[in-house]
Regions:
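Aromatic-Pro/Gly-enriched surface loop or interdomain linker
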Residues: 71-81, 89-96, 145-186
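Bacterial N-terminal signal peptides
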Residues: 6-15
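Proline/serine/threonine-rich low-complexity linkers at boundaries of modular beta-sandwich domains
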Residues: 20-46
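Short beta-strand segments of immunoglobulin-like
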Residues: 51-56
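Extended acidic/polar, glycine-enriched regions
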Residues: 73-74, 84-86, 101, 107-109, ...
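Structural beta-strand segments of beta-rich domains
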Residues: 60-64
Length: 186
């Protein structure tokens, strides 16, 4: 009897521990190999883009602005970064093949070397499901005929709280962003 009680307690405790932690549950899913979601060269400017916001809450819509060389078609797939059995990411949405747009030149500031592409038009959107698990997401954009890149963004769950705080280095990502010909380190 005692052994049955201990086994029952362990099973119930394990179930509720995993059930109450959506991130642990999500990361236990099978993932996609890096050969599917990775990009060989993040400085490949044949296709490049950004999200309208770096951080969005579940239920919001992320808006992408994407420049595609020669206006070629492209695919857009959304992945969540996580453990996933060592695969590193899991496909969350496939927006399919989209028509590419050659965007106007960004507004440059020669004194700082910065380039502002806020004048680009919206290329695609993704409505973040209300059930999405918080974390780092990437949109892999892949141009027909070659070229791929990532657009990183964070999905939050504003209804939850945690003892753990994780800050993503988006300022560092921007500093190393070489789009337009140079980064902060060139």
């Amino acid at each position: 009897r005692r052994l049955l009680f201990v086994i029952f307690y362990v099973v119930v405790f394990t179930f509720f521990s995993f059930a109450q932690n959506a991130i642990v549950t999500e990361n236990a899913n099978a993932g996609n190999p890096i050969s599917e979601w990775g990009v060989p060269d993040f400085r490949d400017n044949r296709i490049a883009g950004f999200a309208n916001k770096m951080s969005l809450s579940r239920g919001e819509t992320v808006r992408f602005k994407i420049n595609v060389q020669s206006g070629a078609n492209y695919t857009l797939r959304i992945y969540r970064i996580g453990y996933y059995g060592g695969n590193g990411a899991r496909l969350m949405a496939n927006l399919g093949t989209l028509s590419g747009t050659v965007q106007p030149s960004g507004i440059s500031d020669p004194s700082t070397g910065s380039l502002d592409c806020g004048n680009w038009s919206e290329s695609a959107t993704w409505a973040i499901p209300g059930s999405a698990v918080s974390g780092l997401y990437i949109a892999k954009i892949e141009r027909s005929g070659g070229g791929s890149n990532h657009i990183a963004f964070i999905v939050r769950n504003d209804a939850s709280n945690s003892d753990l705080y994780l800050q993503f280095p988006d300022a560092t990502w921007q500093a190393y962003n070489g789009y337009g010909g140079n980064s902060m380190y060139d």
